[in-house]
């Protein structure tokens, strides 16, 4: 009988396979992907695991299933820039993601990340920045992701949702936040949170910097 850990590993492989097919545009929007049976045979997996994975992808709007049409289809092409409305329990947000491939990690941010994990070389990391806006379209949060090109290319608008980031940020491998540091920007007094994420083998994947612009959470006399 397959162990829970082996089951999780197999699930990661299947997630990675499907996501890379979509990200590489080998399966563009509208493409019918492999059936449950085909995936079950290809990966020597159980039907229940395949259905769990497909249901998760359905919930993230990466694939769709239409009544009257057999099979699952790619819902949309995975682009690297967008203007996307998301919804949480209280506040609608408009999230704009811009690629900053020519921008490297600022020295001050590199020093902070290095203080968290000195074993990672942050010297040549590049970044993606996501700006989130409130219902009045006022910018209240900036998220910056730093890593190597092959890591950054997996990002899409859905990665701004925390659970999706954990599930899929690194080609389908489960990602865990292992280290975090909270501080205050000397000039703006905005709250800054620095996070490092690792895979389940404790290998560093990506760094994230969160800057909260909402004046209600600025630190006074810091």
UniProtKB/Swiss-Prot annotation:
Gene3D superfamilies: Winged helix-like DNA-binding domain superfamily/Winged helix DNA-binding domain
Every HTH gntR-type domain range: 8-77
Keywords for the protein's UniProt record, in alphabetical order: DNA-binding, Transcription, Transcription regulation
Protein name: Uncharacterized HTH-type transcriptional regulator MG101 homolog
Transcription is among the record's keywords: yes
Keyword Transcription attached: yes
Molecular functions (GO terms): DNA binding; DNA-binding transcription factor activity
Highest taxon, organism lineage: Bacteria
Signal peptide location: none
Alphabetized InterPro entries for the sequence: Tscrpt_reg_HTH_GntR, WH-like_DNA-bd_sf, WH_DNA-bd_sf
